């Protein structure tokens, strides 16, 4: 397979660290640079626990793109920074794989239009775990037969956004196979605000944030005399790397924006 030159934004995070290790062990990936505002001017090998890679670190993406030739930007930063990075990448014609969440419908619409206009491949993935993507697809299938459903997503207590992008994407897929319906008793009253979680077209999403968790979600379907639970658990960040690898390889052949790994797996 042809060599792919990759820039990683956010190498110091747990996901970023796993991604650097992925670069090291994948023959056709070449980490040509990283972006980290705290370590501009250093090399990847200067960071604690990193492999001996000489890729330079830049304090900002704009400077990095001025000096480095790359095929793909892999962004694993925060939601706000990720939005800035993908916008810049698309405008510059650089393919990007974005692992941050929190995009609004309007932001996705604008990015989709710009990516199409520029003919630049872009993948935004709420979840890189292949198992999580299958969990979403199975939930979409089940929604055709079970109209009553609620979603519980559980993550580590350092996650900044709630509900998770995976939960939101799951509900979007379920809605495609489910008529609009308010879940629960029509006259129910919350004695404490938020007790029933977020409400998306009648589907409730409950967010849990605790130390010790990584990324987990269960989708609970209820029916007469039965219940179906579809659950996925990520126990470490290595679970996301197969999806990261697939995304980088796939985005090279795209000329538009794709939202969600379920749209690129067979």
From Swiss-Prot:
Positions contributing to NAD(+) binding: 10-15, 99-101, 125-128
Record keywords: Amino-acid biosynthesis, Cytoplasm, Diaminopimelate biosynthesis, Lysine biosynthesis, NAD, NADP, Oxidoreductase
GO molecular function, one term: NAD binding
Organism encoding this protein: Bacillus thuringiensis (strain Al Hakam)
GO biological process, alphabetically ordered: diaminopimelate biosynthetic process; lysine biosynthetic process via diaminopimelate
EC number: 1.17.1.8
Stated name of the protein: 4-hydroxy-tetrahydrodipicolinate reductase
Family the entry assigns: Belongs to the DapB family.
